[in-house]
């Protein structure tokens, strides 16, 4: 039986050795798998961090571009407000001229605008009170000197304009208010005004 025991012992030893070798091989393979997984995880982590950094840079660029755009918009808006104010002040200055000077400007504008000489002049309520009694008569004289039949009349009607006048011929009204003239001329002169202001 000693021979059987030896065989048994030998089989057990070989089985143990085989098991240990298998365990060792499995542990080595597991260690390799873990190492590769760790390397892969580190690489993915680096990729994710790099991507996050790039996204942060992109977000920063976008935010900067948006801030610059907003600053340009505000600057443009401020410029526009200054330009608007300049044009509004022009209207205010015209309206605040001394009555005689104001009347002369309006008179000249009317003479230059009249075509038939029989139009009606519509003023603002304020200007209607402001003009002298001989205002229309003076305009008609100037028209006659230009060879135009001077039969201009001051309308009973008034319009809500800050200054200037409305020239009415039948059903047609031509707006010669300061606001309308400035609005029409603004495009032509705005670039020069901006250049002068800035």
From Swiss-Prot:
Belongs to the V-ATPase E subunit family. GO terms for molecular function: ATP binding; proton-transporting ATP synthase activity, rotational mechanism; proton-transporting ATPase activity, rotational mechanism. This is V-type ATP synthase subunit E. Produces ATP from ADP in the presence of a proton gradient across the membrane. The keyword Ion transport applies. The gene is atpE. One of its GO terms (biological process) is proton motive force-driven plasma membrane ATP synthesis. It holds the Pfam family vATP-synt_E. Gene3D superfamilies: ATP synthase, E subunit, C-terminal (3.30.2320.30), F1F0 ATP synthase subunit B, membrane domain (1.20.5.620). It comes from the Bacteria. InterPro entries: ATPase_E_C, ATPase_V1_Esu. SUPFAM superfamilies: V-type ATPase subunit E-like.
